[in-house]
A protein has these predicted regions:
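Residue-level detector of beta-strand face positions
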Residues: 1, 83-85, 105-107
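Short, conserved beta-strand segments within well-ordered enzyme catalytic domains
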Residues: 1, 9-10, 33-35
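Short, flexible, glycine/charge-rich loop motifs used to bind or transfer phosphoryl groups or to couple energy/partner
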Residues: 1, 22-25, 43-45, 104, ...
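Zn-dependent metallo-beta-lactamase
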Residues: 1-7, 17, 26, 48, ...
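Metallo-beta-lactamase
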Residues: 7-10, 15-16, 90-180
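Active-site HxH/HxHxD metal-binding segment of metal-dependent hydrolases
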Residues: 15-86, 178
Length: 186
């Protein structure tokens, strides 16, 4: 949950969280918008019962029938580079396809961190796209990290240190390029 002066944004709803709306209301009394890093049920499952709208990358609409079949709310679309203004605090929407075609990272430039869902740092690399797309995504995110001096990306799961550093994103570029070139196999 990211809170500004006038609004709050919940990044991912998790799954099987009973009374998520009440839990969020116990933290903030501001209006809350739900955004998803991607549409897998471990990130959107609790949205079904508690949120009338969810904002996603339009590239992930292909996954709605499989991963969100019971969601009856309104699906709204984010745009790459969009600024979500919470009043005194903003998040930038950065499309980061890789884990899914519509994976998205939300960057808080002022705080120098981002929320990457399963795009970076979630402990394993389950690709929903090809390696060339992953390389493009990593290069794009690396440029955003450098431009805004982002210190960490916080992933959607806890496996180990639970944050991704700029160097590890660069390492993903090298690893992916080495796999594509045949330098690394296995």
């Amino acid at each position: 949950l990211v809170e500004g002066e006038t609004k709050a944004i919940l990044i991912d709803a998790g799954t099987k969280i009973k009374d998520l709306d009440k839990l969020v209301a116990s933290i903030t009394d501001k209006p809350v918008t739900l955004v998803a890093t991607h549409v897998h049920p471990d990130h959107t499952g609790s949205a079904i019962d508690y949120f009338p709208e969810i904002y996603i990358n339009p590239a992930d609409t292909i996954g709605i029938p499989e991963f969100m079949p019971n969601y009856k709310g309104k699906v709204c679309f984010l745009t790459d580079g969009e600024i979500l203004d919470l009043g005194g605090r903003t998040l930038e929407v950065v499309f980061t396809p890789g884990h899914t075609p519509g994976s998205t990272t939300f960057v808080d430039k002022d705080a120098a961190y981002g929320f990457s869902g399963d795009s970076f740092g979630s402990g394993n690399l389950l690709l929903g796209v090809d390696f060339s797309t992953l390389i493009s995504t990593c290069k794009k995110m690396s440029a955003v990290i450098e431009k805004y001096d982002i210190k960490y990306l916080y992933p959607g799961h806890y496996f180990g240190m639970n944050k991704e550093t700029p160097q590890r994103v660069k390492d993903m570029i090298t690893m992916s390029e080495d796999i594509l070139s045949g330098k690394v196999q296995g």
